[in-house]
UniProtKB/Swiss-Prot annotation:
Fe cation binds at H110, H114, D317. One of its GO terms (biological process) is tRNA threonylcarbamoyladenosine modification. The gene is tsaD. This is tRNA N6-adenosine threonylcarbamoyltransferase. It comes from Solidesulfovibrio magneticus (strain ATCC 700980 / DSM 13731 / RS-1) (Desulfovibrio magneticus). Binds 1 Fe(2+) ion per subunit. Belongs to the KAE1 / TsaD family. GO terms for cellular component: cytoplasm. Its cofactor is Fe(2+). Required for the formation of a threonylcarbamoyl group on adenosine at position 37 (t(6)A37) in tRNAs that read codons beginning with adenine. Is involved in the transfer of the threonylcarbamoyl moiety of threonylcarbamoyl-AMP (TC-AMP) to the N6 group of A37, together with TsaE and TsaB. TsaD likely plays a direct catalytic role in this reaction. The keyword Glycoprotein does not apply. It catalyses: L-threonylcarbamoyladenylate + adenosine(37) in tRNA = N(6)-L-threonylcarbamoyladenosine(37) in tRNA + AMP + H(+). It is an enzyme of class 2 (transferase).
Length: 371
């Protein structure tokens, strides 16, 4: 099966072809430079850029791959959660292509696709316990199979990625700041007491990073030397040696606080599974963070479980994961009609496919049992 994937959920415009379990080709246009001027994603600009770039990217994809739309067996598109205006651009394109060609349309849960990115090209054993960490979501998910999911815990306010982004703003780091915090903290021993490990004094698997955001902002306000305007330009590229040691230690300490918080909750969930999972999975943009990847590798080694992490390029938003998830869904007989709707961030993505085997899989954004 050859599946076309379309990703426009936030600020990456991407299209990809995926065939028989392997990516064929992806074309991606990043908007990072556009939004860097504003210190974050501007939704109106993001949707306009998707509209401008999506058509040429599709043309470039088919030209470079030697394939045509006639070769495609299914059309998959990210339907949410994400920025509503951005999602609508991708959905409009996918619906138009489906209507014109008669090819099946598959709306893909963006979070589900992130988790399945860790399985691309790998024979992952199920059930698996998954950790999804991104700019907008932090979840612990049990995967009975690739298409059967149960959310065990999620963030009650801010996600881990949001904590990284807001901390970067507090320290006046360039956008996207999470990458700077990761790189600047490398090789520096963290001060393990500098920042709190939030929301651990409970007995469930949910997260809250709002308190950590406040702690970092307070620390930055008390140390204005870390927010000097010149810091944003120091070193040009990410050259850790060009940045003040005090800032690097703060970044290392923040990496530790977030990684340790994730570890404690993830290990708590692992201990309370009805049966031991066969695999561990982690995915999402924050899963590219070095200390978090190292923490997960250590946890997996201690538990004697295989750990599956996406390649760094597949941690960020991309169309390969949308096409891969769409392929699995299409092969199982799932599809949508043209009434498919976009689901903005903060809303549950419904499992409203037509066809497929009996029984439903839970949405990846379903409510946590702890709420």
């Amino acid at each position: 099966m050859l599946c076309l994937g379309i990703e426009t959920s936030c600020d990456e415009t991407a299209v990809a072809l995926f065939e028989n379990g392997r990516p064929v080709l992806e074309k991606l246009a990043s908007q990072a430079d556009l939004h860097a001027v504003f210190g974050g994603v501007v939704p109106e600009l993001a949707s306009r850029e998707h509209l401008r770039r999506l058509g040429p990217l599709l043309q470039a994809l088919f030209a470079a791959s030697g394939r045509s739309l006639a070769d495609v067996d299914a059309i998959a598109v990210a339907r949410g959660p994400g920025l509503l205006g951005s999602l609508l651009v991708g959905l409009a394109a996918a619906k138009g292509l489906s209507l014109a060609t008669g090819k099946p349309l598959i709306g893909v849960d963006h979070l589900h696709a992130h988790l399945l990115a860790a399985t691309i090209g790998r024979d992952v054993a199920f059930p698996a316990l998954g950790l999804l960490v991104s700019g907008g979501h932090t979840q612990i998910v049990r995967l009975e199979s690739a298409l059967s999911l149960e959310v065990l815990g999620r963030t009650l306010d801010d996600a881990a990625g949001e904590a990284f982004d807001k901390a970067a703003k507090s320290f006046n780091l360039p956008y996207p700041g999470g990458v700077y915090i990761d790189v600047l903290g490398r090789g520096i021993a963290p001060d393990k007491t500098l920042f709190p490990r939030p929301f651990l004094d409970n007995d469930h698997f949910d997260f809250s990073f709002s308190g950590l955001k406040t702690a970092v902002a307070s620390y930055a306000a008390a140390h204005p030397e870390l927010r000097a305007g010149s810091l944003a330009e120091a070193g040009g590229a990410i050259d850790p040696e060009a940045w003040p040691m005090a800032l690097r230690r703060a970044c290392s300490s923040l990496n530790f606080a977030i990684a340790e918080t994730l570890r404690i909750k993830f290990e708590r969930a692992l201990d309370r599974q009805p049966g031991p999972p066969a695999s561990l999975i982690a995915a999402g943009g924050v899963a590219a963070n070095g200390p978090i990847r190292a923490m997960l590798a250590d946890l997996a080694a201690r538990r004697g479980l295989p750990l599956y992490l996406p390649e760094p390029a597949l941690c960020a938003d991309n169309a390969v994961m949308i096409a891969a998830a769409g392929s699995r869904l299409a092969e199982a007989g799932y599809a949508h009609d043209l009434a498919l709707t976009a689901v903005p961030r903060g809303r549950k993505v419904p499992w409203d496919y037509a066809g497929g085997p009996s029984g439903k899989a839970a949405s990846v954004d379903s409510a946590s049992p702890a709420q």
